[in-house]
């Protein structure tokens, strides 16, 4: 299965440029229908806005954008370029503009819609969708902190920790790195700590 970046969650941010108010929003979506539904939702919510420009990218599917009445190439295209530069898939972005009475010009509009998309993406965060190996690792307390550092070094996620006679860890690691991680634990602890592979999951985690 492929690895690809998606937005972690809904993200929203806004700014004012020469009295025009710009509100940028992004959502994670799985289908073009979901993306179009979000766009329609924003058009209804901001029916009084001057423009509701949008862009979306669906993995192995549609790439679409709209200037929604702004001069051609000044809104939707800059927004889609932000999403592409950020490497994101399964994402829809809407930038709403309330006109403030001062014209921005073509260059100013491109900069404003680029900024609107970028700050919304930053607010949403990024997650990597990939195959993760699920590992069960029981360890003595003396190794707990060192193992946490190794999990981080290998790009893993410590999902659950149980404290009893020893520490029991549930760890998710990128599929390609899990065996190297287990080998590292064996070497680091002189064989004291051994992990078990308990399954796999295909999901996204923040990066």
Tell what function each PLM region has.
Residues 1-73, 196-205:
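C-terminal regulatory domains involved in ligand/effector binding and gene-expression control
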Residues 61, 71-88, 163-165:
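Positively charged, aromatic-enriched nucleic acid-contacting surfaces
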Residues 147-152, 180-189:
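Short amphipathic alpha-helices in soluble, non-transmembrane regions
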Residues 171-178:
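Terminal, non-globular segments
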Residues 126-143:
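Short glycine-/aliphatic-rich beta-strand segments at the starts of folded cytosolic domains
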Residues 77-123:
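Active-site beta-strand/loop microenvironment that shapes enzyme catalytic pockets
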Residues 138-156:
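Short amphipathic alpha-helix segments
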Residues 158-162, 189-206:
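Conserved short beta-strand edge segments in small beta-sheet-based binding/regulatory domains
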């Amino acid at each position: 299965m492929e690895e690809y970046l998606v937005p972690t969650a809904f993200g929203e941010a806004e700014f004012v440029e020469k009295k025009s108010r710009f509100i940028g929003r992004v959502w994670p979506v799985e289908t073009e229908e979901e993306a179009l539904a979000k766009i329609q939702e924003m058009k209804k919510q901001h029916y009084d806005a001057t423009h509701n420009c949008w862009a979306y990218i669906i993995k192995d599917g549609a790439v679409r954008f709209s200037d929604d009445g702004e001069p051609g190439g000044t809104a939707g295209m800059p927004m889609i370029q932000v999403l592409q530069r950020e490497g994101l898939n399964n994402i829809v972005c809407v930038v709403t503009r309330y006109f403030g009475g001062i014209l921005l010009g073509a260059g100013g509009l491109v900069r404003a819609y680029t900024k609107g998309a970028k700050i919304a993406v930053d607010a949403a965060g990024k997650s990597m969708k990939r195959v993760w190996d699920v590992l069960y690792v029981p360890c003595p307390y003396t190794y707990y902190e060192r193992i946490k550092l190794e999990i981080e070094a290998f790009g893993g996620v410590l999902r659950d920790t149980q404290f009893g006679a020893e520490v029991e860890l549930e760890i998710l690691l990128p599929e390609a790195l899990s065996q190297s991680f287990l080998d590292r634990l064996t070497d680091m602890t002189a064989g004291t700590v051994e992990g078990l592979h308990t399954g796999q999951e295909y999901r996204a985690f923040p990066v």
